[in-house]
Amino acid sequence: MSDYKSTLNLPETGFPMRGDLAKREPGMLARWTDDDLYGIIRAAKKGKKTFILHDGPPYANGSIHIGHSVNKILKDIIVKSKGLSGFDSPYVPGWDCHGLPIELKVEQEFGKPGEKFTAAEFRAKCREYAATQVDGQRKDFIRLGVLGDWSHPYLTMDFKTEANIIRALGRIIKNGHLHKGAKPVHWCVDCRSALAEAEVEYYDKTSPSIDVAFRAVDQDAVKAKFGLPGVSGPVSLVIWTTTPWTLPANRAISLAPDFDYALVQIDGQAVILAKDLVESVMQRIGAAEYTILGTVKGAELELLRFTHPFMGFDVPAILGDHVTLDAGTGAVHTAPGHGPDDYVIGQKYGLETANPVGPDGAYLPGTYPTLDGVNVFKANDIVIELLKEKGALLHVEKMQHSYPCCWRHKTPIIFRATPQWFVSMDKEGLRQQSLKEIKGVQWIPDWGQARIESMVANRPDWCISRQRTWGVPMSLFVHKETQELLPIERTLAAMEEVAKRVEVDGIQAWWDLDPKEILGEDADQYEKVPDTLDVWFDSGSTSYSVVDARPEFAGHAADMYLEGSDQHRGWFMSSLMISVAMKGKAPYRQVLTHGFTVDGQGRKMSKSIGNTVSPQDVMNKLGADILRLWVASTDYTGEMAVSDEILKRAADSYRRIRNTARFLLANLNGFNPATDMVKPEEMVVLDRWAVGCAKTAQQEILKAYEAYDFHEVVQRLMRFCSVEMGSFYLDIIKDRQYTAKADSVARRSCQTALYHIAEALVRWMAPIMSFTADEIWGYLLGEREKYVFTGEWYDGLFGLEENEEFNDAFWDDVRYIKDQINKELENQKANGIKSNLEAKVTLKYADDANGTIKKLKLLGEEVRFIFITSQFVISEQAGGIDDENIQYNAGNTTVQAVVTRAEGDKCPRCWHYTTDVGKVAEHADICGRCVSNIAGNGEQRKFA
């Protein structure tokens, strides 16, 4: 017997079966860097329509975690897919470099500013620390395969950016949005600084819950309001609070104007509280017997005065819309220095904004003898004892409730009125204009719109001043006596002068500045404001300080901001506020948010639980492309689950896609697209169907990329590789590829299809599996650019026409019939028919057969290649189908498949069973078809 292996067209490629990504990817990255791939892409896309995804700056502190990876990979997928869609999509990564976390790190190592180092030296240490953090994070982001201008990122501590942040504040001042006030702000006593909304987290805390009686100053006047002069005992208004430490700052009691308030007689006294809460309050204070003497509307009690239980002054009853019946007594303890609602109502009534608490959280001297110098959280017990002594405490109990805490220290914070600078939400219509602008933005997912609308509608003025060392200075001058801001025109001119100096020397230029250099003779009357800007102002102003300033953005506004869902109250909010305050318009056209990462059981990532997934570990074990594929295949609109098992599934999907690509490349062995391409009209019908299948898949994949629906991209890609190609087309063509004459139309037609499919597939993969796409690109044939990322989606696909006889609908039916026959072939393994090629299939049909069955007959001898059997007979069954073997419906036609053993002998070359093996003397071992392919003109294929 001759060895016919050398006569076969066996697949061959240098593209490895195993990805071995962890080892190969670093080498590819080195080539990308050496070639300046990002620069090559920018040059290739020059002059195209722009798409700008503006990078929200991560904080320059610590190693990147899995959430960072999700964020950067999603951005990279979008930027690369936009490039393939014909856009010039520059990506400039950034970092947030000022602020408290960096200060704390430097303090831990070197001490507080002014101890071992001057403030100037401390800032230099902070700058140095931030730079090292940026370098560390940058290496990891690059390792993820994220393409961007990593050599020229933006840092909020860049001198030019710092200067532009000052200029942004100047524009906001010019537009009338800045004001100064002693308003209550979130205050962390550990940071000794105000906190932004986005720096506040909520945790459960146990606090004392107390009911306190404020005795009426004019008892008769209060009784008269209820028309009950003969009430027994004193009358008091009862408040409820969970922050007893704020009582020294109480300046009023708020009532709802339309609620009914009851005068209730209990043991030897009468108390006033909301009628609807009488029963719950009486149960709470243990009053088994009580009588409601009368009721009046809250409005009737306005401006009646009540004695503070221990502070020695009286306070008014006032009316406010913030009073509810959800809990308490319906009478709200009001301390304008310790709460935003209290402050607003206090302004309306001209109340004092009292703040008896220092920056360290201790009462200031002169507050109250037993409270002076005591930390407010330790003062609750002292206040409760005071109330007991004064006979004003009706009830005390412990309750657990959600309480605001510092994001950095995880410790409870307080509201504390301090002199601060604010961006006003309403003075110049910032709130209304922002709400208007929100409606013009596309929010993805769409629930993001309602979320940020609610936040903007309800947020207080934005406190932008901080009492920190490492931050952009506000660069303002105020009068030493009046504390009034330098006149507006002079303020703006002075700020520009400061900005010019900062542009050269950084923020230290402000602290080194002698006011005389700018203010001249007036310097004696004015002093520099020592405050720095909230870091959310730094990052929030990047639409101006970065996007407007970078030449590659060419004056275009950002098309997209993309961050985690917590940024509605963070970067999306601050960016919106600043852009609208400066320019009257939103800084973005689209805002996309992704969920947080959780483990396989849906639990939050936590080092203490030990369920964190390190992106560095994943890249070192599996490779970045597996991490990228996991991100793309996960629905980012909700929580994103990740675990070793989930990543293993991503690796399995990756292998299926890689194997498909390898099959395509291996079977393009010996194909030259310049000389061997077959014209579409001359191709085998099945090959044209396969190219058309790729065309349909491409339309759906591009639509999904356009909608940022990346898990749909992956699902469609998998369906194409596994179902349409792997289990149908690629399986069928193996016989033709391997056994047909090497340069026959039958084989070249197939290779033409594989070439077109490979050209499309590598581009679909590129935004997601960037390393693997680059690797495949290097093995593709024909003249091409060096990198897949510089081109666009493949435009050489075509398909079958709908009016053709063997159109897509026909092949859909064929795939269905093939699936059913494969099930029967599987069943026959028990009867000794071990492989499809050992089988003969007889397809019987009734005389009412539909067009698909009749068309199958037209395929003649080629039909067996579709079903991968040695023989395939289609036979009309007179009198209908019996119930023997398998029956199923194919397009309203009942057909029956009968599987028997194939006739003849096995050909050692093609492995088909046939009755003509050995009929040609010169090739006595093989079948006639193989003889033709070796020594003759080669078999002709028209359909399959």
UniProtKB/Swiss-Prot annotation:
GO molecular-function term, one example from the UniProt record: ATP binding
Binding site for Zn(2+): C907, C910, C927, C930
Highest rank taxon of the organism: Bacteria
InterPro entries: aa-tRNA-synth_I_CS, aa-tRNA-synth_Ia, Anticodon_Ile_BEm, Ile-tRNA-ligase, Ile-tRNA-ligase_type1, Ile-tRNA_ligase, M/V/L/I-tRNA-synth_anticd-bd, Rossmann-like_a/b/a_fold
Domain notes: IleRS has two distinct active sites: one for aminoacylation and one for editing. The misactivated valine is translocated from the active site to the editing site, which sterically excludes the correctly activated isoleucine. The single editing site contains two valyl binding pockets, one specific for each substrate (Val-AMP or Val-tRNA(Ile)).
SUBUNIT field: Monomer.
Function comment: Catalyzes the attachment of isoleucine to tRNA(Ile). As IleRS can inadvertently accommodate and process structurally similar amino acids such as valine, to avoid such errors it has two additional distinct tRNA(Ile)-dependent editing activities. One activity is designated as 'pretransfer' editing and involves the hydrolysis of activated Val-AMP. The other activity is designated 'posttransfer' editing and involves deacylation of mischarged Val-tRNA(Ile).
Protein name stated in the entry: Isoleucine--tRNA ligase
Species this protein is from: Salmonella paratyphi A (strain AKU_12601)
